[in-house]
From Swiss-Prot:
Its EC number is 5.5.1.13. Residues 1-63 form a transit peptide. Residues 1-87 are annotated as: Disordered. Belongs to the terpene synthase family. Tpsc subfamily. It is an enzyme of class 5 (isomerase). GO terms for biological process: diterpenoid biosynthetic process; gibberellin biosynthetic process. Pfam families: Terpene_synth. Mg(2+) binds at D379, D381. This is Ent-copalyl diphosphate synthase AN1, chloroplastic. It comes from Zea mays (Maize).
């Protein structure tokens, strides 16, 4: 069964929040390159030359798309230069602040839960005066200090009826138990009276964990304590009472006492429990699945010493206001890395991220993980996120872990779950995209999660029971539309900047809670400023390229202004850092000149003598007299020589000097030219009757791009090795074969109905090749760092071709506008 092809391309037309621009960070080399680019080619010649879803239906969509226009060029280069003046030093305070946050990570920073605090407050004093006083008075003080002005308890920034009702009732019960604060109890009961009707209006997806059992249990406790002024018979409660009975009957009583399950997290208020058996399932830290409320209830029922030690420890740690769940160390470490990477700012925190991933790897098990280390219950959400990040960071993790979450052809988050979580399947899909050859369980996970999420999308049901996020539907859509191979780094960052809610994103446990190291405005501010800084630099480079394009008359060879933008966009979307301007501009310029020469060679292919002379002139630089008869030949010959001079000047300096760089660039271009001239007419072009698409290069141009990028990056040894030994390097050969397949697939896609079978076959071949390449790229080995970087360049350029092959033009143009021109 083929992989589900994720490209129906449902273009989003949401209005995006726009913010003011900042300048772009500048590195010395980037400044030099930008000045030359803006100056134009006349300044570049001062140095003397040294000698389940059918792949064929990719572009068919049920919606009518209007072609997006690329945003217009900015005004004057000086305007952009003024905007670019802010140095990277302006970002340093934010970078330092985030770094301090990352280095503070321990067992998880999370907000207090009034509900859990109330359960701990209900624990009577051990060995005291018959239980007439609370064992943990700090929790009572916290309750008194945190009542909201409307009489309720709960999250003050986001109103959820479920959250406010269960928090408020729990706090009223706790205060009533100790006959404290009658006025506060009265205010809480008044709030419950006035808002009970809201429970009937709430969506089921936003119901906290175990609410159907915990809330009725609290109501019964209130009744037992003699709380009179409570609407016990309110109509909104009837369905909750009924659901409680249904859920209690569904709980496998014997199993929950024999093996660890997620039920351990919600024991409070459950009747008829066999505590001696349940104590055998206690977590190693003394808790019941890291739940303060469940553990407090167990402590009241058993007096267990380990339960007491766990509760006592967290009460002291959090000054009375205990969290909804603790610890959450693995959850925090994993999600922090994910947020930093998707926001496009991970490059500032490589050491901290490496420490996070080492921590996660130490606690990884073949059965999976949970939100906390050493958990005896695992879940697919944390497991999938950890698997994906560990694999992307080079750790050797087996996909067989997902067999623990598969049954009867379906995948689940927890054993015995009642509903499927959208984010669980979302993260499973993201993990399944990082697959190697032969990993069938990941194939099954990808098919299942893809179909589940697409169905929810069609139903308008992308809502989750674990998080209230700013734009979860947008996150899901992007992941399905642009899987890992097709997700270019700067496109992902620009998209996620509009989706990340910062401190406003809220998690759903037994109550609403917040993870300040996962969701905060500091990350968002740094990411926005960093993106806008980089974007300003990219706009300067675009202005320089526009001038360079016109001065070299590339329009005479079929290269259009939009092609300039698209070529630069592919480079900037993969190599975006200010310090790598030379590599980025080398990629864009080489792509455009190569396209122009390719067009020219096709145009003169019938004139064998002219073709031979043109190629001969380009590598015999002193023999140019014949060119006077052919103005177009003169234009291209001059443009290429200027480009080689410019690239040699902008390349990272090396010990051998600029002349050696110039020689290597000339050699790479000469070899490419000879291959292009001697190449037979491509049978795919002949069959399709169309010109090749400039964004999807053939293997010769693909290798030329990589060689030029490596030379300009100063990795000369790798570039020389590539030129001399590419036929013997399997990684290079496989990337070239994949490039050919992408080129072929792009041509066939002009008539998907006619070529559906062939496209499907090619897609399978491309998928297998990409899996094999990914395995070689990601797994840690003893390669030199420079070799790994060269592999990364091969991979980045190939991914850009994969993206261009599978993206309709209007979508590419939309991304060009958002990445290059539209500030966040």
């Amino acid at each position: 069964m083929p992989y589900p092809h994720p490209y129906p391309w449902q273009s989003s037309r949401r209005r995006r929040r726009r913010r003011g621009r900042d300048g772009a960070p500048r590195q010395p080399q980037a400044r030099r390159v930008v000045e030359r680019a803006a100056a134009g080619p006349g300044h570049a010649t001062t140095t003397q030359q040294p000698d389940n879803v059918s792949s064929a239906k990719v572009f068919q969509t049920s919606r009518v798309e209007t072609e997006s226009e690329i945003a217009k060029w900015p005004g004057k280069p000086q305007d952009l230069e003024d905007e670019h003046q802010a140095e990277e030093a302006e970002l340093q305070p934010l970078i330092d602040q985030v770094r301090a946050m990352l280095r503070s990570m321990n067992d998880g920073d999370t907000s207090a839960s009034a509900y859990d605090t109330a359960w701990v407050a209900m624990v009577p004093k051990v060995g005291g005066d018959g239980g007439a006083q609370p064992q943990f008075p700090a929790t009572v003080r916290w309750i008194v200090d945190h009542q909201l002005p409307d009489g309720s308890w709960g999250d003050s920034a986001l109103f959820s009826a479920y959250d406010r009702m269960i928090n408020t009732l729990a706090c009223v019960v706790a205060l009533t138990k100790w006959s404290l604060e009658p006025a506060r109890c009265e205010a809480g009961l008044s709030f419950l009276h006035e808002n009970m009707w809201r429970l009937a209006e709430e969506e089921a997806e936003s119901m906290p964990i175990g609410f159907e059992i915990a809330f009725p249990s609290l109501i019964q406790t209130a009744r037992d304590l003699g709380v009179v002024d409570f609407p016990y018979g309110h109509p909104a409660l009837q369905s909750i009472y009924a659901n409680r009975e249904v859920k209690l009957k569904r709980i496998p009583r014997d199993m929950m006492h024999r093996v660890p399950t997620s039920i351990l997290h919600s024991l409070e208020g459950m009747p008829d429990l066999d505590w001696p058996r349940l104590l055998n399932l206690q977590s190693c830290d003394g808790s019941f699945l890291f739940s303060p409320s469940a553990t407090a209830y167990a402590l009241m029922q058993t007096g267990d010493k380990k339960c007491f030690e766990y509760i006592d420890r967290i009460v002291k740690k959090f000054n009375g206001g205990v969290p909804n769940v603790y610890p959450v160390d693995l959850f925090e470490h994993i999600w922090v890395v994910d947020r930093l990477e998707r926001l496009g700012i991970s490059r500032y925190f490589q050491r901290e991220i490496e420490q996070c991933m080492d921590y996660v790897n130490r606690h990884w098990t073949e059965d999976g993980i949970c939100w906390a280390r050493k958990s005896n219950v695992k879940d697919v959400d944390d497991t999938a996120m950890a698997f994906r990040l560990l694999r992307l960071h080079g750790y050797n993790v087996s996909p067989s872990v997902f067999k623990n979450f598969e049954k009867d052809g379906e995948f689940f988050c927890f054993v015995g779950q009642s509903t499927q979580a959208v984010t669980g399947m979302y993260n499973l899909n993201r993990a399944s995209q990082i697959s190697f050859q032969g990993e069938d369980v990941l194939h099954r996970a990808r098919v299942f999660s893809y179909e589940f999420l697409r169905q929810r999308e069609e139903q308008g049901m992308i809502r989750d029971k674990w998080i209230v996020a700013k734009d979860l539907p947008g996150e899901v859509q992007y992941t399905l539309d642009f899987p890992w191979y097709a997700s270019l780094p700067r496109v992902e960052a620009r998209t996620y900047l509009d989706q990340y809610g910062g401190k406003d994103d809220v998690w759903i446990g037994k109550t609403l809670y917040r993870m300040p190291l996962v969701n905060n405005d500091t990350y968002l501010e740094l990411a926005i400023r960093d993106f806008n800084h980089c974007q300003a630099l990219h706009q300067l480079e675009c202005n320089g390229l526009q001038t360079w394009y016109k001065d070299n008359c590339l329009d005479a060879f079929g290269v259009e202004p939009q092609d300039v933008l698209r070529s630069y966009f592919l480079a900037a979307a993969c190599i975006f850092e200010p310090s790598r301007a030379a590599e980025r501009l080398a990629w864009a310029r080489t792509s455009m000149i190569a396209n122009a020469i390719s067009t020219h060679l096709r145009d003169i292919s019938e004139d064998k003598k002219r073709l031979e002379c043109f190629v001969h002139c380009l590598y015999e630089e002193n023999d140019v007299s014949w060119l006077k008869r052919n103005p177009n030949d003169v234009i291209l010959e001059r443009a290429l020589r200027r480009l080689i001079n410019l690239l040699a000047q902008e390349a990272l300096p090396i010990h051998e000097g600029q002349r050696f760089i110039h020689s290597l660039l000339s050699l790479a271009w000469t070899e490419w030219m000879l291959q292009k001239a001697n190449k037979e007419e491509n049978k795919y072009h002949k069959c399709s009757g169309i010109e090749p698409q400039y964004m999807v290069h053939d293997r010769q141009t693909y290798l030329l791009l990589v060689q030029v990028i490596e030379i300009c990056a100063g990795r000369i040894g790798e570039a020389v090795s590539m030129i001399n030994n590419k036929d013997n390097d399997w990684f290079i050969q496989l990337t070239c074969a994949t490039c050919d397949s992408l080129n072929h697939r792009m041509l066939l896609s002009q008539d998907t109905m006619k070529n559906e079978a062939r496209i499907n076959w090619i897609e399978k071949e491309i998928e297998l090749n990409m899996q094999e390449l990914a395995q070689s790229l990601l797994l840690r080995c003893d390669e030199k760092t420079s070799n790994k970087k060269t592999k990364k360049t091969l991979w980045d350029v190939l991914r850009s071709l994969y993206y261009a092959t599978h993206s309709p033009q209007h979508m590419i143009d939309r991304h060009v506008s958002r990445v290059i021109f539209e500030p966040v």
